[in-house]
Design a protein with these regions (language model features):
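Short Pro/Gly-enriched beta-strand edge/turn motifs at strand-loop
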Residues: 51-54, 132, 167-171
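Short linker/helix segments within small regulatory modules
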Residues: 160-166
Length: 201
């Protein structure tokens, strides 16, 4: 049995800059000089199938997007993600809505021809570890916002807060947070006899 040499999403060193998230003035300044990853219905923008497609905050592809979410500092570069799922691609380029994997690619008219929205499962191994981490984080947090638009306490519409890492209810004051706890999957192996222990619980 060969042990993995690298662990996906493990130890990339991305500075999440949690202390800056609640400062709206600082976030505005970071966004102005930052880069944004557009995400369409869970698919990140990708260049030539091998790299994430970062754009400037004022790019036309973001015109109909929701509020950006701060992902963190990648060195000195502030990274954000923005949900543009309300954009409708031209006829014939729709996503495959059923099944485990969507092989379709959507191209926005405001982007170069080698830029497209692709299913993360299909490109994960082509991305750098940092790119894979940022894409997975963007997909997860934006999906959380789309599926948690209403307060679980009173049912009123909630609002994005703290640079995208909280939803606040203006009606009852409740605060809601995404799940960010780590998950570990283990496999018990008997190397000498080439066996694994299966169980459920």
């Amino acid at each position: 049995m060969r042990l993995a040499e690298t662990v996906t999403f493990g130890g990339s060193g991305l500075n999440r800059a949690v202390e800056l998230r609640g400062d709206a003035v600082q976030m505005a300044a970071l966004l102005e000089r930052g880069q944004v990853l557009p995400v369409w219905r869970g698919k990140p923008l990708v260049v030539a199938g091998v790299a994430l497609g970062w754009v400037a905050p004022g790019h036309p592809v973001l015109a109909h997007g929701r509020a950006p979410v701060f992902l963190g500092l990648d060195g000195d570069v502030p990274r954000f993600a923005q949900d543009i799922s309300d954009w409708a691609p031209e006829a014939g380029a729709e996503a495959v809505e059923h099944g485990f994997f969507d092989p379709s690619e959507q191209r926005h008219p405001a982007l170069p021809g080698d830029h497209g929205f692709l299913e993360l499962r299909g490109i994960m191994t082509q991305l750098t570890p940092r790119g894979a981490e940022l894409a997975a984080m963007a997909r997860a947090i934006l999906h959380w916002h789309r599926s948690h638009g209403f307060c679980a306490t009173c049912g009123a519409a909630s609002e994005m807060a703290v640079a995208g890492w909280q939803r606040s209810c203006p009606a009852c004051g409740a605060q809601h947070f995404p799940r960010t706890d780590p998950v570990v999957i283990m496999l018990t192996v008997d190397v000498a006899r080439d066996l694994v222990l299966l169980g459920r619980g």
